[in-house]
């Protein structure tokens, strides 16, 4: 029998300081890409965009990003299916995944294995804070001042 402790995903050590971490972002809308790029570049992150979940799955294995952000409604492999596949694959299961959508889908995102869910429209401070918190959970949260 497998204990709950044995099922926990291993935490990948951060090789890149969080401010220069590579973020793989799955978004097809060019206007939203521009907004996300501005928010994340402004915070000091390196961002790589892809159009669909299948591309993201392939690049996640090749690039080993620090975090993956995905919209639910993307072509091919949707964001929830992408999340499930990432979390089921040993070499990618430790990568934090943030799912975002205009849909009220937080429960479905969590069930798919998402580490966080953000409702669109995205707010810069919330997006950046969630990314920072997932990259280094021991840092004090800017929102609360607490770890």
Residue ranges and their predicted role:
Residues 1-24, 28, 125-147:
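Non-catalytic signal-transmission and effector/linker regions of two-component phosphorelay proteins
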Residues 33, 74-75:
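The feature encodes the CheY-like receiver
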Residues 34-42:
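Charged docking surfaces used in two-component/phosphorelay signaling
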Residues 37, 81, 102-119, 125-129, ...:
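Alpha4 helix (beta4-alpha4-beta5 surface) of REC/receiver domains from two-component response regulators
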Residues 44-51, 59:
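Short hydrophobic/Thr-rich beta-strand motif most characteristic of the beta2 strand and flanking loop
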Residues 52-55, 78-81:
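Acidic catalytic/metal-coordinating carboxylates
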Residues 71:
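Active-site residues of response regulator receiver
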Residues 93-104:
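A short, hydrophobic beta-strand element within the central beta-sheet of small alpha/beta folds
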């Amino acid at each position: 029998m497998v204990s709950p402790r044995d099922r926990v995903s291993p935490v990948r050590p951060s090789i890149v300081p969080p401010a220069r971490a590579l973020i793989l972002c799955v978004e097809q809308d060019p206007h939203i890409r521009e907004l996300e790029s501005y928010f994340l570049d402004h915070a000091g992150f390196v961002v790589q965009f892809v159009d669909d979940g299948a591309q993201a799955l392939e690049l996640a294995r090749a690039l080993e990003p620090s975090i993956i952000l995905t919209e639910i409604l993307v072509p091919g492999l949707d964001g929830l299916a992408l999340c499930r596949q990432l979390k089921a694959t040993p070499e990618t299961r430790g990568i934090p995944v943030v799912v975002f959508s205009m849909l009220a889908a937080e429960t479905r995102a969590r069930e798919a294995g998402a580490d966080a869910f953000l409702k669109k429209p995205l707010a810069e401070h919330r997006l950046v804070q969630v990314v920072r918190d997932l990259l280094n959970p021991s840092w004090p949260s800017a929102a609360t001042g607490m770890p």
